[in-house]
Amino acid sequence: MQIVCNEGNVIKPYLVYQKDAVAEYWIPGAFSNETASRVLEGTKKVVNDSNGTGYAAHRDDILLAGKTGTAEIKASKDDTSGTELGWFAIFTAEDTVERPILIISMVEDVKGRGGSGYVVKKDSLVLEEWFSSH
């Protein structure tokens, strides 16, 4: 998701937290600015459109963006007894946010519990704590 937030540029990852680190592009121009902007707008709709799959994490006070996903784990194409895992990536979508956040979560065995929607609901609790505690 960071490629979308950085106008199509892949930031060089750091293994050690550096409070005053300056972002260094690892793969400049991996996406065009136009493509990154389109994807970002789509991820905003996931959380902010009432029909979006991540709408349960919507907040009126902070603009968030995200992507949901569900993977079926099964032995064959015709297998109906497999399980599912759900995942959700959500991040603050404004540069002016005082306490930005990026959460990427995955939960196994969400079949019958709402798929990725189950993960969205769990992350909404984390977001509430994050934004209300400061």
Regions found by a protein language model. Name each.
Residues 1-25, 50-134:
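Active-site beta-strand/loop architecture of penicillin-binding DD-peptidases
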Residues 24-50, 131:
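C-terminal beta-signal and terminal closure region of outer-membrane beta-barrel proteins
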